Amino acid sequence: MIRDINFGGLLNIPCPTIPAEFANWLFVECFDPEASELVFPGRGRIPVTPDSVARIFNLPNKGGKVMYELDVDAINSIQSKYDTIQGSAPKIDQIMEMLKNSKTADEDYLRGWLMIAISTFLCPPTSLAISPRCYPALVDLSAVKKLNWCEFMMNQLKDAAIKINKKNSVRGCILLLVVSFTLFSTCSNTCFADSLDLL
């Protein structure tokens, strides 16, 4: 079911945690959101683009724009489907518990899984709650694989980097930066150009 919407790449991530200080350093000190690159003065640059996201995480890299905004109709639609989602935004733990207790892999399960994927990986908010901004993209599950999730991840990461001085918090998929750097650093200086092509 998850693979049917082209999100199977997220099931193959073997990394349960990331080095927080290192990831924050890459995000705050090295990532240039305007150029969409990790910049290391005197050593080179590593492009971080929607194509990078597609190659690393195998998510959809073409299609329509992912709507990530507060939409009353979408909020009402999602709340009407789940007893646990009423009033304020549900906690991530609540949705995870709902998934654990689910007896069938149906649309409700898939929608809940996507809420978790977006709120913990693709575009984690600064709180421990599911952001209702993700609801518009999840109302019609048949359209999920027709959206450009790679572009969405990059746009959210770049937006977070631009606003980093205004908010004392880090959001966005910084694991992308860690993996991009790791792929680059595993190559020797002799394959500098090849390492850039990988990304």
Labelled PLM ranges:
Residues M1-E107, L114:
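N-terminal leader regions that mediate targeting or early regulatory function
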